[in-house]
From Swiss-Prot:
This is Low calcium response locus protein G. It comes from the Bacteria. Keywords: Plasmid. Residues 65-95 are annotated as: Disordered. Residues 65-82 have a biased composition (Basic and acidic residues). Coiled coil: none annotated. One of its GO terms (biological process) is negative regulation of gene expression.
Protein backbone atom coordinates (compact mmCIF):
# COMPACT_ATOMS: atom_id res chain seq x y z
CA UNK A 1 0.00 0.00 0.00
CA UNK A 2 1.24 3.47 -0.83
CA UNK A 3 2.11 5.84 1.93
CA UNK A 4 0.26 9.11 2.38
CA UNK A 5 3.34 10.90 1.08
CA UNK A 6 2.89 9.27 -2.34
CA UNK A 7 -0.87 9.90 -2.23
CA UNK A 8 -0.19 13.62 -1.97
CA UNK A 9 2.10 13.45 -5.00
CA UNK A 10 -0.51 11.52 -6.97
CA UNK A 11 -3.17 14.05 -6.05
CA UNK A 12 -0.91 16.96 -7.01
CA UNK A 13 0.03 15.26 -10.28
CA UNK A 14 -3.64 14.73 -11.19
CA UNK A 15 -4.44 18.36 -10.39
CA UNK A 16 -1.52 19.50 -12.55
CA UNK A 17 -2.71 17.33 -15.46
CA UNK A 18 -6.22 18.80 -15.18
CA UNK A 19 -4.82 22.33 -15.06
CA UNK A 20 -2.77 21.69 -18.21
CA UNK A 21 -5.80 20.24 -20.02
CA UNK A 22 -7.93 23.23 -18.96
CA UNK A 23 -5.21 25.60 -20.10
CA UNK A 24 -5.00 23.91 -23.51
CA UNK A 25 -8.79 24.04 -23.86
CA UNK A 26 -8.82 27.72 -22.87
CA UNK A 27 -6.07 28.52 -25.37
CA UNK A 28 -7.98 26.74 -28.15
CA UNK A 29 -11.17 28.65 -27.33
CA UNK A 30 -9.26 31.93 -27.23
CA UNK A 31 -7.79 31.24 -30.68
CA UNK A 32 -11.26 30.49 -32.07
CA UNK A 33 -12.70 33.65 -30.55
CA UNK A 34 -9.90 35.79 -31.95
CA UNK A 35 -10.30 34.23 -35.39
CA UNK A 36 -14.05 35.01 -35.25
CA UNK A 37 -13.38 38.73 -34.90
CA UNK A 38 -10.51 38.74 -37.39
CA UNK A 39 -7.51 39.02 -35.07
CA UNK A 40 -4.34 37.42 -36.36
CA UNK A 41 -2.27 35.19 -34.06
CA UNK A 42 0.45 37.86 -34.07
CA UNK A 43 -2.01 40.48 -32.80
CA UNK A 44 -3.19 38.14 -30.05
CA UNK A 45 0.42 37.53 -28.98
CA UNK A 46 1.03 41.28 -28.75
CA UNK A 47 -2.17 41.83 -26.77
CA UNK A 48 -1.59 39.13 -24.17
CA UNK A 49 2.23 38.92 -24.02
CA UNK A 50 3.81 39.96 -20.74
CA UNK A 51 0.52 40.51 -18.95
CA UNK A 52 -0.39 39.31 -15.48
CA UNK A 53 -3.33 37.00 -14.80
CA UNK A 54 -5.23 39.93 -13.26
CA UNK A 55 -4.96 41.80 -16.57
CA UNK A 56 -5.63 38.82 -18.82
CA UNK A 57 -8.90 37.67 -17.22
CA UNK A 58 -10.80 40.95 -17.83
CA UNK A 59 -9.37 41.15 -21.36
CA UNK A 60 -10.59 37.64 -22.15
CA UNK A 61 -14.00 38.45 -20.65
CA UNK A 62 -14.23 41.62 -22.76
CA UNK A 63 -13.24 39.66 -25.87
CA UNK A 64 -15.93 37.07 -25.15
CA UNK A 65 -18.55 39.81 -24.62
CA UNK A 66 -17.58 41.45 -27.93
CA UNK A 67 -17.93 38.15 -29.78
CA UNK A 68 -21.37 37.60 -28.23
CA UNK A 69 -22.44 41.11 -29.32
CA UNK A 70 -21.23 40.48 -32.87
CA UNK A 71 -23.03 37.14 -33.09
CA UNK A 72 -26.27 38.70 -31.85
CA UNK A 73 -26.05 41.41 -34.53
CA UNK A 74 -25.50 38.95 -37.37
CA UNK A 75 -28.51 37.04 -38.65
CA UNK A 76 -28.00 33.30 -38.57
CA UNK A 77 -29.29 32.72 -42.10
CA UNK A 78 -29.47 35.94 -44.14
CA UNK A 79 -31.57 34.40 -46.94
CA UNK A 80 -33.82 32.27 -44.78
CA UNK A 81 -37.15 32.10 -46.63
CA UNK A 82 -36.06 34.55 -49.36
CA UNK A 83 -34.45 34.18 -52.72
CA UNK A 84 -31.09 35.93 -52.87
CA UNK A 85 -31.06 38.92 -55.19
CA UNK A 86 -28.79 39.13 -58.16
CA UNK A 87 -26.05 41.75 -58.09
CA UNK A 88 -27.16 45.09 -59.56
CA UNK A 89 -25.15 44.64 -62.76
CA UNK A 90 -26.84 41.30 -63.49
CA UNK A 91 -30.47 42.29 -62.91
CA UNK A 92 -32.51 41.94 -66.06
CA UNK A 93 -29.96 39.72 -67.78
CA UNK A 94 -30.89 36.21 -68.76
CA UNK A 95 -28.12 33.73 -68.30
Amino acid sequence: MKSSHFDEYDKTLKQAELAIADSDHRAKLLQEMCADIGLTPEAVMKIFAGRSAEEIKPAERELLDEIKRQRERQPQHPYDGKRPRKPTMMRGQII
